[in-house]
Every structure is written in structure tokens, then in C-alpha cells.
Amino acid sequence: AGGTPKPVPLRDDLTLDPAVVEEAITDDTAMFVVNSPGNPTGAVSPEADVREFARIADEHDVVCLSDEVYEPFVFDGEHHSPVSYADTDSVVVVNGCSKFYSMTGWRLGWVTASTRRIERMLRVHQYIQACASAPAQYAAEAALTGPQGVVDEMRETFEKRRNLLLDRFAEMGVEVPTPKGAFYAMPKVPEGFVDACIDRGVIVVPGEAFGDGGAGHARLSYANDTEALREALDVM
């Protein structure tokens, strides 16, 4: 759409600093993106920061696009959305079934926004994709209206795996900003760590794949079987 991304640095705990976001805004800024709980970091924005994101969007008349696909997977504290604190329609929320219900391959998500913004999105959307498939829509309806206990079980399982990962990295002497949500971690790793893991059959992603700020880190996903995670940690 002709936009130019402008990366901003994260804090040491890998959360997004509202002050840094606001400082980066210019007259040409149309939108900034918030992702909490986050991929690739697992970071969760505290409520005070989320309130600030809403204020920034309101006062600067820019869109805050809040990616909340990992919403149910918060281990420490609660999930907060900037749309809850906005005084205007400057916050747009995207979400989906991929993470909530392990429906990644079904490709079904949604946008929550004001009527005027949805109408503008539809002008583009209708020429890109006619609609989500009928089976995906029926499956999503069943997931959204059915018992949610399975989501709670997933969150509890992810938290146990996170704790396992943190304990093992502590034993290794590797620094890991504590992920408070999603199912990712980004430890600080020595040079050659990623290649060494891959050579030994453990898939990790170099932090640089997510931008210059990821240098010196590796992204790990613990959305895997616990025993497989133990084996991977043994290799590391």
C-alpha cells in the first residue's frame, strides 16, 4: 500500500515502549502496530502501556493496529486491549482462530473496528478474497460457541512448558527475558548457536529474521510435545 515500515527498539524485557512509539510518529505516520502477547518475543504489554497506546492513537490521529491472536495465552497478569481505552475509533483489532483453537490451517480471522473503517477495508478485501470457506466458518462457529475449557488447558500446558524452558536455560547460564504469554521465547545466545542447533536437528530461528533488534537472540517455540521440548533442550 506504499507504506514504509519504521522499526523501533524494544525494552530489555522485549516489551514495546509507548514513549519510543510516540517519539517515532511524524506527520506522515498512518499506523503503528501493537502485538501483545507477542510473536516472536512472548512479551505481554502491561495495562499502563496499553492505555498509552490508545492515547497515542487518539491524540495523533493515527491507527493503532492491535494484533491479539494470542489473547488467551497470558501467564502472568491479564490481557489488555487498547480498544478498551480509546476515546476514538483509532484502534483496530485483528484476531483469529489459529492460536485459540489450533486452527492455523483453516485460515480464518476477523477485524474489530468502527463501521467506517470496516467499509473502507471491504473495498479492498472484496477484490482480494471473496470469503472464508464454508467449512472454516462452521468450524469457527463451533469453536467460539462451544466449551472453552480446552483453551484453558492449552494455556496451562504452555505455561508449564515455558517454566521448563526457563529452568533449563537458567541451568545453562543463558539469559532469557521471561515470556509472559504466547508460546515463544527469545534467549540471548552466543554466535553460532542457531547453526549448531539446526545441525543437530533442533529448529530455532535466528533473531535477525525479525529485524536488526533481534541480533544476538534466537526465537524458540514451545508449542510442541513436552518430551520433544525436553529432548531439544538436552541438545541445546
Where on the chain are the PLM-derived regions?
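PLP-dependent class I/II
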Residues: 1-236
